Protein backbone atom coordinates (compact mmCIF):
# COMPACT_ATOMS: atom_id res chain seq x y z
CA UNK A 1 0.00 0.00 0.00
CA UNK A 2 1.31 3.44 -0.97
CA UNK A 3 2.29 5.75 1.88
CA UNK A 4 0.98 9.27 2.09
CA UNK A 5 3.10 12.37 1.63
CA UNK A 6 2.44 13.33 5.26
CA UNK A 7 3.76 10.01 6.59
CA UNK A 8 7.16 10.73 5.00
CA UNK A 9 7.31 14.18 6.63
CA UNK A 10 6.32 12.68 9.98
CA UNK A 11 9.00 10.00 9.77
CA UNK A 12 11.70 12.56 8.96
CA UNK A 13 10.71 14.71 11.96
CA UNK A 14 10.96 11.74 14.36
CA UNK A 15 14.74 12.22 14.25
CA UNK A 16 15.43 15.79 13.06
CA UNK A 17 19.16 15.50 13.82
CA UNK A 18 19.66 12.74 11.24
CA UNK A 19 19.43 12.43 7.47
CA UNK A 20 18.59 15.23 5.05
CA UNK A 21 16.49 17.09 7.61
CA UNK A 22 19.55 17.67 9.82
CA UNK A 23 21.30 19.77 7.17
CA UNK A 24 18.08 21.58 6.30
CA UNK A 25 17.46 22.42 9.97
CA UNK A 26 21.04 23.70 10.31
CA UNK A 27 20.45 26.10 7.42
CA UNK A 28 17.07 27.18 8.78
CA UNK A 29 18.47 28.03 12.20
CA UNK A 30 21.08 30.29 10.60
CA UNK A 31 18.22 32.33 9.13
CA UNK A 32 15.94 32.13 12.18
CA UNK A 33 18.63 33.58 14.46
CA UNK A 34 18.72 36.76 12.37
CA UNK A 35 14.93 37.17 12.43
CA UNK A 36 12.79 38.81 15.08
CA UNK A 37 11.35 37.02 18.10
CA UNK A 38 7.91 36.71 16.45
CA UNK A 39 7.75 36.27 12.68
CA UNK A 40 4.66 35.62 10.59
CA UNK A 41 5.36 32.93 7.99
CA UNK A 42 3.59 31.97 4.77
CA UNK A 43 3.34 28.24 5.39
CA UNK A 44 4.10 25.79 8.22
CA UNK A 45 7.54 24.17 8.51
CA UNK A 46 5.95 20.90 9.65
CA UNK A 47 2.90 20.56 7.43
CA UNK A 48 1.90 17.17 8.84
CA UNK A 49 1.92 18.42 12.45
CA UNK A 50 0.14 21.66 11.56
CA UNK A 51 -2.64 19.77 9.78
CA UNK A 52 -3.00 17.42 12.75
CA UNK A 53 -3.48 20.42 15.03
CA UNK A 54 -6.15 22.06 12.87
CA UNK A 55 -4.24 24.17 10.33
CA UNK A 56 -5.94 24.85 7.00
CA UNK A 57 -4.50 26.77 4.04
CA UNK A 58 -7.34 29.27 3.90
CA UNK A 59 -8.17 32.87 4.72
CA UNK A 60 -8.33 33.63 8.42
CA UNK A 61 -5.61 31.13 9.41
CA UNK A 62 -2.13 32.50 10.20
CA UNK A 63 1.12 30.83 11.31
CA UNK A 64 3.80 32.65 13.33
CA UNK A 65 7.22 31.36 14.39
CA UNK A 66 8.18 32.43 17.92
CA UNK A 67 11.58 32.14 19.60
CA UNK A 68 11.91 32.05 23.39
CA UNK A 69 15.12 31.80 25.44
CA UNK A 70 15.84 28.43 27.04
CA UNK A 71 16.29 27.84 30.74
CA UNK A 72 14.54 28.86 33.94
CA UNK A 73 13.16 32.19 35.03
CA UNK A 74 15.23 35.36 34.97
CA UNK A 75 14.78 36.67 38.51
CA UNK A 76 16.42 39.76 39.96
CA UNK A 77 17.80 39.86 43.49
CA UNK A 78 15.26 41.31 45.95
CA UNK A 79 16.23 44.64 47.48
CA UNK A 80 14.08 44.25 50.61
CA UNK A 81 14.52 41.61 53.30
CA UNK A 82 13.05 38.14 53.10
CA UNK A 83 13.54 34.86 54.89
CA UNK A 84 15.89 32.44 53.18
CA UNK A 85 13.16 30.36 51.56
CA UNK A 86 11.76 33.39 49.72
CA UNK A 87 15.09 34.87 48.68
CA UNK A 88 15.71 32.49 45.79
CA UNK A 89 17.05 33.82 42.51
CA UNK A 90 18.88 30.93 40.81
CA UNK A 91 17.58 27.48 39.89
CA UNK A 92 13.97 28.67 39.76
CA UNK A 93 11.80 27.69 36.82
CA UNK A 94 8.60 29.24 35.54
CA UNK A 95 5.39 27.39 36.29
CA UNK A 96 4.57 27.28 32.59
CA UNK A 97 6.35 25.71 29.64
CA UNK A 98 8.29 27.61 27.00
CA UNK A 99 5.67 26.49 24.49
CA UNK A 100 2.96 28.25 26.52
CA UNK A 101 5.11 31.38 26.71
CA UNK A 102 5.43 31.26 22.90
CA UNK A 103 1.65 31.05 22.49
CA UNK A 104 1.08 33.98 24.85
CA UNK A 105 3.63 36.17 23.08
CA UNK A 106 2.11 35.45 19.67
CA UNK A 107 -1.36 36.20 21.07
CA UNK A 108 -0.14 39.54 22.44
CA UNK A 109 1.31 40.55 19.09
CA UNK A 110 -1.72 39.51 17.02
CA UNK A 111 -4.47 40.77 19.31
CA UNK A 112 -7.32 40.21 16.86
CA UNK A 113 -6.43 36.52 16.45
CA UNK A 114 -6.87 33.53 18.74
CA UNK A 115 -4.34 30.77 19.32
CA UNK A 116 -5.52 27.43 17.97
CA UNK A 117 -2.43 25.36 18.76
CA UNK A 118 1.35 25.24 18.48
CA UNK A 119 4.22 22.82 17.91
CA UNK A 120 8.01 22.61 18.27
CA UNK A 121 10.18 23.27 15.20
CA UNK A 122 13.70 23.53 16.58
CA UNK A 123 16.14 24.63 19.26
CA UNK A 124 19.78 25.48 19.76
CA UNK A 125 21.90 26.15 22.84
CA UNK A 126 20.10 29.32 23.85
CA UNK A 127 16.57 29.33 22.41
CA UNK A 128 13.59 27.26 21.29
CA UNK A 129 11.39 27.89 18.28
CA UNK A 130 7.68 27.05 18.14
CA UNK A 131 5.19 27.70 15.37
CA UNK A 132 1.84 29.00 16.60
CA UNK A 133 -1.36 28.57 14.58
CA UNK A 134 -3.63 31.60 14.97
CA UNK A 135 -7.20 32.03 13.74
CA UNK A 136 -9.24 35.17 13.00
CA UNK A 137 -12.58 34.61 14.82
CA UNK A 138 -14.31 37.41 12.87
CA UNK A 139 -13.46 36.18 9.38
CA UNK A 140 -16.50 34.77 7.49
CA UNK A 141 -14.39 31.85 6.23
CA UNK A 142 -13.74 30.83 9.85
CA UNK A 143 -17.24 31.52 11.19
CA UNK A 144 -18.71 29.24 8.50
CA UNK A 145 -16.08 26.51 8.84
CA UNK A 146 -17.41 23.31 10.37
CA UNK A 147 -14.07 22.45 11.97
CA UNK A 148 -12.88 25.89 13.15
CA UNK A 149 -16.13 27.80 13.70
CA UNK A 150 -16.22 26.98 17.43
CA UNK A 151 -13.28 29.34 18.10
CA UNK A 152 -15.41 32.34 17.09
CA UNK A 153 -17.44 31.98 20.31
CA UNK A 154 -16.72 34.47 23.10
CA UNK A 155 -15.98 31.50 25.39
CA UNK A 156 -12.61 31.21 23.66
CA UNK A 157 -11.35 34.75 24.19
CA UNK A 158 -7.79 34.78 25.55
CA UNK A 159 -7.38 31.00 25.16
CA UNK A 160 -3.59 31.14 25.46
CA UNK A 161 -3.65 33.16 28.70
CA UNK A 162 -6.27 30.94 30.34
CA UNK A 163 -4.41 27.70 29.62
CA UNK A 164 -7.05 26.34 27.23
CA UNK A 165 -4.71 25.33 24.41
CA UNK A 166 -3.20 21.85 24.23
CA UNK A 167 0.06 23.02 25.83
CA UNK A 168 -1.94 24.91 28.46
CA UNK A 169 -4.05 21.94 29.55
CA UNK A 170 -0.90 19.81 29.78
CA UNK A 171 0.84 22.37 31.99
CA UNK A 172 -2.19 22.58 34.28
CA UNK A 173 -2.19 18.81 34.79
CA UNK A 174 -5.48 18.26 32.96
CA UNK A 175 -4.22 15.50 30.65
CA UNK A 176 -4.84 12.70 33.15
CA UNK A 177 -7.76 11.75 35.36
CA UNK A 178 -8.25 9.69 38.49
CA UNK A 179 -5.76 8.68 41.17
CA UNK A 180 -2.95 11.15 41.65
CA UNK A 181 -4.66 14.09 39.97
CA UNK A 182 -7.13 15.02 42.71
CA UNK A 183 -5.42 18.37 43.35
CA UNK A 184 -5.45 19.55 39.72
CA UNK A 185 -9.20 20.13 39.54
CA UNK A 186 -10.96 22.50 39.35
CA UNK A 187 -7.53 24.14 39.02
CA UNK A 188 -4.04 23.97 40.48
CA UNK A 189 -4.43 27.32 42.27
CA UNK A 190 -7.85 26.23 43.56
CA UNK A 191 -6.00 23.60 45.61
CA UNK A 192 -3.25 25.90 46.93
CA UNK A 193 -0.83 24.69 44.23
CA UNK A 194 -0.66 21.22 45.78
CA UNK A 195 -1.34 19.50 42.45
CA UNK A 196 1.86 20.60 40.76
UniProtKB/Swiss-Prot annotation:
GO biological process: cytoplasmic translation
Region (Disordered): 69-100, 161-196
One GO CC term on file: cytosolic large ribosomal subunit
Pfam families: Ribosomal_L15e (PF00827)
Compositional bias of kind Polar residues: 186-196
Domain of life (superkingdom): Archaea
Keywords linked to the UniProt accession: Ribonucleoprotein, Ribosomal protein
GO MF: RNA binding; structural constituent of ribosome
Family annotation (HAMAP family): Ribosomal_eL15
Protein name, entry field: Large ribosomal subunit protein eL15
Species this protein is from: Halorubrum lacusprofundi (strain ATCC 49239 / DSM 5036 / JCM 8891 / ACAM 34)
Gene that this sequence comes from: rpl15e
